[in-house]
Design a protein with these regions (language model features):
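Transmembrane core module of solute transporters
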Residues: 1-163, 271, 275-296
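Hydrophobic alpha-helical segments of secondary membrane carriers
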Residues: 43, 167-171
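Cytoplasmic loop-to-transmembrane helix junctions
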Residues: 160-167, 250
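Hydrophobic transmembrane architecture of multi-pass small-molecule transporters
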Residues: 171-274, 279-296
Length: 296
């Protein structure tokens, strides 16, 4: 893994050097000298990370820990998509009125808040414990999508628009893939880590452990389990509970990490500087060759 990481970093460095020196680069990295576009690209990358990582985590959480079927988990995460679809047209309508900074900043804040809420779940939750964070997340994504892409590309000249659009979408797709990989890796590592911590706290000499195993053994005896198998089944059920709780904690950990990332990039919103103008005025000024006004 280390060797592949070194090869990847060297290859990335050579690629960046080549693209910066080429007269007609395949990926025009010079566009990142534009502060508004660069900050918008960073925010768009984090947006892609949260979007894809969240879409990866929630179905796994519902099916693996809560026993949802694929259909039920799809219905459970539907509020996010519905909220996003309803919010995007509204965000487009109020974009010129409130400006991109407020829309994007508030959208990132409530999205981070939704991931923080998801980091506080347990295996004893119900549907509504999922519904409200998912809906809030959809509203946040819906507010950011339209406003961020418009603001990021508004300072790009027309000849560079195609390259800038491709670069913006490229970063968002790449970080989306990174988000899924990061989430999967952290789930595995977190599960092992939290399981080790939980196992350290289990001992026959602890009153809670002893009481739990005695209660469970009594239940198994009442169910007609052979006495010789009771102890083995008790340990098996205890192991299952520990694994379940460790997995739950690892999901919470990943959601918390994503929330921290969203909170951390909010200052980039203040670097957005964009032209905000009605379509009618924009068409008239463009026809006359006049400069479009700036709104920061």
């Amino acid at each position: 893994i280390l060797a592949l990481a070194v090869i990847s970093l060297v290859g990335l460095g050579l690629f960046v050097m080549r693209e910066l020196q080429a007269e007609r680069p395949a990926v025009n990295l010079r566009l990142l000298r534009n502060v508004t576009f660069a900050s918008g690209t960073v925010l768009g990358g984090v947006l892609g990370l949260g979007l894809f990582a969240g879409l990866f985590l929630m179905p796994m959480f519902l099916q693996k820990l809560l026993g949802y079927t694929a259909v039920d988990s799809g219905l459970a995460i539907m509020p996010r998509s519905v909220a996003m679809a309803l919010t995007m047209p509204v965000a487009g309508r109020i974009y010129n009125r409130v400006g991109p900074k407020r829309l994007v900043g508030f959208g990132f804040f409530i999205t981070a808040l939704s991931f923080w809420q998801l980091s506080r779940l347990s295996v004893a939750i119900g549907y509504w414990d999922i519904f409200f964070p998912q809906t809030l997340q959809g509203v946040g994504f819906g507010m950011v999508f339209v406003a961020l892409s418009t603001a990021s590309l508004s300072t790009i000249s027309k000849p560079d628009m195609t390259a800038a659009t491709g670069l913006y979408n490229f970063f968002r797709q790449i970080t989306g893939s990174v988000g899924i990989a990061m989430a999967a890796s952290q789930l595995t590592r977190g599960g092992n880590h939290y399981r080790a911590l939980l196992v350290e706290g289990i001992s026959d000499y602890r009153d809670k452990t002893h009481a739990w195993t005695q209660t469970l053994s009594g239940v198994l005896n009442q169910q007609g389990i052979e006495p010789s198998m009771v102890h083995q089944k008790t340990l098996g059920l205890l192991d299952k509970v520990v694994t379940q709780q460790a997995t739950m904690l690892s999901f919470n950990h990943v959601h918390f990490l994503i929330a921290c990332i969203f909170f951390a990039v909010i200052p980039f919103v203040f670097l957005l500087r964009t032209r905000v103008i009605s379509l009618e005025t924009q068409s008239g000024k463009a026809a006359k060759g006049e400069e479009l006004p700036w709104k920061t």
